[in-house]
A protein has these predicted regions:
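Fe(II)/2-oxoglutarate oxygenase catalytic core
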Residues: 1-132, 136-159
Length: 159
């Protein structure tokens, strides 16, 4: 589980900078289990990712071409990960008073040539997405492989 020191560090960085990059925050055995789950999921569990939500959700290959599979607690790796993230959610609420009420997560698979164009990770007119987490499960990833997350400051400068 997340330690008090880890939670303090994450909350302080989010309050000061608006983001944090963490290496080796989750146990190695959990990462291996999540990667195994992600790659062993059958093809029919991955679906074309959409943009928007609820009635406004649509598949738009001009915006994103990845496929996603939702993580749930039906397997040990998913349960352990979601429990860890639930503790993080609770700790951030306690330290930052941000009112995050739930957490959802999915695996995303980007085939060669797939992408997700620059976007705001919140829905227009809603304030429900306050914190976003990204966990890379790629083994032996190198910068020339592409796929980096690019974060922009409010004035659009790349961080």
């Amino acid at each position: 589980m997340i330690s008090e020191q880890q939670a303090d560090r994450i909350a302080a960085a989010l309050a000061a900078e608006g983001y944090i990059i963490l290496d080796d925050i989750l146990p190695d055995d959990l990462l291996v289990s999540l990667a195994s789950q992600a790659t062993s999921s059958t093809a029919n569990t991955y679906k074309a990712a959409g943009v928007g939500r609820e009635q406004g959700m649509q598949h738009n290959a001009a915006v994103r071409k990845d496929e996603i599979s939702w993580i749930d607690s039906s397997n040990p790796a998913g349960k352990e990960y979601l429990d860890w993230m639930e503790r993080l959610r609770s700790e951030l609420n306690r330290r930052l008073f941000i009112g995050v009420f739930d957490y959802e997560s999915h695996y995303a698979h980007y085939a060669p040539g797939a992408y997700y164009k620059t976007h705001l990770d919140a829905f227009k007119g809603n304030t429900n997405r306050i914190v976003t987490t990204v966990l890379y499960l790629n083994s032996n990833w190198r910068p020339e492989n592409g796929g980096e997350l690019v974060v922009y400051s409010p004035d659009s400068d790349c961080i």
